[in-house]
Amino acid sequence: MEKREQLYAGKAKSIFNTDDPDHLVMLFRNDTSAFDGKRVEQLDRKGMVNNKFNAFIMGKLQAAGIPTHFVKLLSDTEALVKKMDMIPVECVVRNLAAGSLVRRLGVQEGQVLNPPTFELFLKNDALGDPMINESHVESFGWATREQLARMKELTFKINEVLKDLFAAGNMLLVDFKVEFGLHKGEVILGDEFSPDGCRLWDKDTREKLDKDRFRQNLGNVVESYELVGQRLGLTF
């Protein structure tokens, strides 16, 4: 597999074409951003940690019957993925109140949400990824009603699989965001799953082990990511 020209560069990853029209190379960089890209720093080893973490999680999800774009690791910072048409919508599940939900609704951080909430956000950096609803998705043609229903179904299934996985490592899956795309007409999981895109707390101490350590200047960001992985049995 030959990596060719860069197709896209996001906040923390770059996507490259390959000599195979059905596959892309996803490069995890050390860039770490917050507040819609207003703050960006380089954190040593982060690209490697997130790449290996993502590969591990994608493997667990695939084993649970959830289709993903992940194919295999290529290097410490690169993965081979299926080429697909991304749906410009983020799906967010919240098991406990945190982040923007607390700010929007004035609820207590850590409040258990039963049942978990499901939210949609438009992927648009210029607009700050605004919250949208299911009618918007269908009316603007970002996804069909059937595709959105499948995205919602898969997101809740991901939640059940990963809640149990992190619980085994004495961690709480507070919330997470996932993105989907279409591959040969099928809705499959795309992008990544890492502590960059979810909230994880230690079950006993409620210590934050995710990107909030960067947002809130708590320090030891990559070390916390590695700790999460180690609790799941990963080695970096």
Swiss-Prot record:
The molecular function GO annotations come to: ATP binding; phosphoribosylaminoimidazolesuccinocarboxamide synthase activity
Question: Which chain positions lie within coiled-coil regions?
Answer: none
Reaction catalysis annotation: 5-amino-1-(5-phospho-D-ribosyl)imidazole-4-carboxylate + L-aspartate + ATP = (2S)-2-[5-amino-1-(5-phospho-beta-D-ribosyl)imidazole-4-carboxamido]succinate + ADP + phosphate + 2 H(+)
The cellular component terms of Gene Ontology attached to this UniProt record, alphabetical and capped at eight, are: cytosol
User: Which cysteines link up through disulfide bonds?
Assistant: none
Query: Could you tell me the keywords of this UniProt record?
Result: ATP-binding, Ligase, Nucleotide-binding, Purine biosynthesis
Q: Which InterPro entries does this UniProt record tie to the protein?
A: SAICAR_synt/ADE2_N, SAICAR_synt_PurC, SAICAR_synth, SAICAR_synthetase, SAICAR_synthetase_CS
- The EC code for this enzyme is 6.3.2.6
- Pathway stated in the Swiss-Prot or TrEMBL entry: Purine metabolism; IMP biosynthesis via de novo pathway; 5-amino-1-(5-phospho-D-ribosyl)imidazole-4-carboxamide from 5-amino-1-(5-phospho-D-ribosyl)imidazole-4-carboxylate: step 1/2
A single Gene Ontology biological process assigned to it is: cobalamin biosynthetic process
Q: Which family does it belong to?
A: Belongs to the SAICAR synthetase family.
PANTHER family xref list: MULTIFUNCTIONAL PROTEIN ADE2 (PTHR43599), SI:DKEY-6E2.2 (PTHR43599:SF3)
Please identify the protein, giving its name as recorded. Answer: Phosphoribosylaminoimidazole-succinocarboxamide synthase
| Taxonomic source organism | Cellvibrio japonicus (strain Ueda107) (Pseudomonas fluorescens subsp. cellulosa)
